[in-house]
């Protein structure tokens, strides 16, 4: 997915110093450009991600809208990053730790890192489901996907991808493989 920045807040009638602070610190997700992601048959979302020009370096945010019957990502858990979801509109289902939990507008969902909390959000309703996805940005990061037996390792330095590797868990090598 391409990185899309949130537009800075509109700042009429502010002093130059206040205007500069607002431009640096405030973003409005209602004016953000959306990227449409589709991977049939299960995955589809409209998403705006706050990335390159965000003032905070240890937090990430996206606004996700998932159509009825779809989900935005596979069932997974993080080794380092924490996530929080704030349901803005609609209803759906949080699949977490093998359980299905109903979610509604106004719910705030906290997901710690670790294998105890594999998760994803499904839109099981007949209307769009819109939520904020907030995460810590801990690098490097490893995600595991229990349903598909995959592992993804990735890292960023100054918002540039320096490592991204996805492979099947059972396709590993011996530590000493190909070493002299």
Tell me what each language-model feature is:
Residues 1-58, 145-180:
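A short, N-terminal "cap"/entry segment at the start of jelly-roll beta-barrel domains
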Residues 28-30, 62, 123:
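Asparagine-centered polar/low-complexity signal
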Residues 63-67, 78-96, 134-138:
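Short, conserved beta-strand element in jelly-roll/cupin
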Residues 90, 106, 121:
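Short hydrophobic/aromatic patches on the structural cores and recognition surfaces of FHA
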Residues 44-49, 62-78, 116:
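Conserved short histidine dyad/triad with adjacent acidic residue
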Residues 98-114:
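Short acidic-glycine-tyrosine-enriched beta hairpin
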Residues 113-140:
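Ligand-binding loop in jelly-roll beta-barrel domains
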């Amino acid at each position: 997915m391409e990185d899309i920045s949130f537009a800075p807040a509109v700042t009429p009638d502010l002093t130059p110093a206040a205007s500069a602070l607002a431009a640096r610190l405030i973003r409005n997700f209602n004016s953000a450009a959306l990227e449409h992601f589709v991977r049939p048959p299960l995955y589809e979302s409209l998403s705006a991600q706050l990335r390159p020009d965000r003032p905070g370096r240890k937090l990430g945010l996206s606004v996700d809208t998932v159509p009825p019957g779809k989900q935005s990502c596979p069932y997974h858990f993080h080794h380092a990053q924490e996530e929080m979801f704030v349901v803005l509109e609609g209803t759906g289902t949080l699949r977490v730790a093998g359980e299905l939990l109903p979610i509604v507008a106004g719910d705030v969902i906290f997901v710690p890192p670790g294998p105890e909390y594999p998760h994803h959000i499904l839109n099981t309703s007949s209307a769009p489901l819109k939520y904020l996805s907030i995460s810590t940005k801990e690098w490097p990061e490893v995600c595991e996907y229990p349903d598909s037996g995959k592992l993804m390792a990735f890292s960023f330095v100054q918002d540039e991808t320096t490592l991204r590797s996805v492979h099947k868990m059972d396709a590993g090598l011996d530590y000493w493989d190909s070493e002299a």
